[in-house]
Amino acid sequence: MSEKLYPVLPEAKKNTLIDNETYLEWYEESVSDPDGFWAKHGRRIDWFKPFTKVKNTDFNGDVTIKWYEDGVTNVSYNCIDRHLKSRGDKVAIIWEGDNPYIDKKITYRELYENVCRMANVLKKHGVKKGDRVTIYLPMIPEAAYAMLACARIGAVHSVVFAGFSPEALAGRIVDCESTFVITADEGVRGGKPVALKENTDTAIDIAAKQYVMVNKVLVVRRTGGKVSWGRGRDLWYHQEVASVEPHCEPEPMNAEDPLFILYTSGSTGKPKGVLHTTGGYLVYASMTHQYVFDYHDGEIYWCTADVGWVTGHSYIVYGPLANGATTLMFEGVPNFPDQGRFWEVVDKHHVNIFYTAPTALRALMGAGDEFVTRSSRSTLRLLGSVGEPINPEAWEWYYNVVGDQKCPIVDTWWQTENGGILITPLPGATDLKPGSATRPFFGVKPVLVDNEGNVQEGVADGNLCISDSWPGQMRTVYGDHKRFIETYFSTYKGMYFSGDGCRRDEDGYYWITGRVDDVLNISGHRLGTAEIESALVSHHSVSEAAVVGYPHPIKGQGIYCYVTLMTGADAQDPDELRKELVQHVRKEIGPIATPDKIQFAPGLPKTRSGKIMRRILRKIAEDEFGALGDTSTLADRGVVDDLIENRQNKK
């Protein structure tokens, strides 16, 4: 544990929206009188019909979560229309292309027109309130237009990260029975094209075999690359928007109407469709964006995430735009044209607030300080971290080298399921400890529970649960409420279980220690081990597979695969087969799931009842096999000896 304490910077304290006294006062009110607190803050968004009920939640039995349930509003209206009078000519989105010489500024008035046109295109082609629309786009302004257009007409968007494979895209189309897809001819990433339309065509064919028929595909021309065309199905975005009106009335939405589905990995193979609704989600995204980043009107805010992840939903699109902010959207990667790109963008667009992932920071730290110090970064006021715990070394580098010791760091903990940040410092209120997410946001009640379900008080280690609801919380797993209850509420009764381990120190600060279930955190993105295992087993040479994480210097966790082969398959050249399996997993899931280590083994360590002992596999992958713990239930000890002998991570 880091013993260093960084007191609130005088500059941060001077202009802050929330000082420590206010934090303590508000927090106390938020947990002792949630109805009163959230009624007050629920009015930060505009309502067509004001709510009279605030909180109606129960973590027991059938688990119901409702906030502002009789209120009527529209997310797109709150992110655009309500700003037009006072800040119509203010820049809403700064788009920075993959190519450093290409950028675009979109004002709130232009955003209104673009979103209304896209909304009218959706309506023209039969998309109605409640229909699911799949968005498979690169980081271009049209991705934000598409999300806001869906919200405007009451369609439910499902954004799929443009790095996912056709198979992964198809699975997400099928699960929510989406019949309308928005994509691009190609994406551009690090100077290289990404075949999005081709992937979409393949995904649609796969979905059709599972009886889900996509009727229309709206294609944004990004590169002008050659694409195949489905007559009567495929539509060019630029032609369609030219043929419709630039005005579209926002659909009145009940606070509990669905806003979006976003798929996230679980500990079982099939990704879960996390469902977020309208009112509570927007209140929470908007409020956390304002107070965590201490956002002041006129500042330039940049979150480097992709809209394919929840961070992009809440902190590139919905939170900032609900607050009338200027949000920067970056198409590129941190190391193209070179490792100084982030800091060049900061200087070019005078960025004040910068929010990124520890994986990117560790990679940039390894490239050397000169890429940072050659830029001025004089406009930076606040730094943020998201996606995984940040190790103290990377934190110190971020603070000292990137921030020149003048920018507080908000190390934020939250998940797709949470809708917004749950544990975080507030820049003008919280003394910082490198590596700690520090204290809960308003209304959030963290609890540490041991494996037997006993609540731990004071200084403790345990499983991180939240004992009461907050407005941004997911409502269900799309189409599978039973799975929602089983995943999050069955392990510890009456509490939401995050799946993360956590430590609380003597100051009441929280330190996230990583996943405690079979989910990996690769470069800040979640992947279920079961998902990777089923991809491996679908290869004709593989009989069985077990996947675990191990510490990785850049990605946080690496992917270590133990594979047993079909009879006869071991005659192949092992290096060639390894390459083949890596390609196979990339094809099934996407590059994000690329295995780092593959170890071929005659067998896996199992109990006499046939259960794989993953604890042992983790220890071997970490090269820590001296402490394997109790192995008395092992069916065959010889299997473990072979695994140790042939481990891929020998130090």
Swiss-Prot record:
GO terms for biological process: acetyl-CoA biosynthetic process from acetate. Its cofactor is Mg(2+). The modification N6-acetyllysine is found at K611. Keywords: Acetylation, ATP-binding, Ligase, Magnesium, Metal-binding, Nucleotide-binding. ATP binds at G387, E388, P389, D411, T412, W413, W414, Q415, T416, D500, R515, R526. The keyword Signal does not apply. Acetylated. Deacetylation by the SIR2-homolog deacetylase activates the enzyme. Pfam families: ACAS_N (PF16177), AMP-binding (PF00501), AMP-binding_C (PF13193). It comes from the Bacteria. GO terms for molecular function: acetate-CoA ligase activity; AMP binding; ATP binding; metal ion binding. CoA binds at R189, G190, G191, K192, T311, N335, S523, R586. It catalyses: acetate + ATP + CoA = acetyl-CoA + AMP + diphosphate. One of its GO terms (cellular component) is cytosol. It is an enzyme of class 6 (ligase). PANTHER family: ACETYL-COENZYME A SYNTHETASE (PTHR24095), ACETYL-COENZYME A SYNTHETASE 1 (PTHR24095:SF14). Belongs to the ATP-dependent AMP-binding enzyme family. This is Acetyl-coenzyme A synthetase. It comes from Brucella melitensis biotype 1 (strain ATCC 23456 / CCUG 17765 / NCTC 10094 / 16M). The lineage of its organism: Bacteria, Pseudomonadati, Pseudomonadota, Alphaproteobacteria, Hyphomicrobiales.
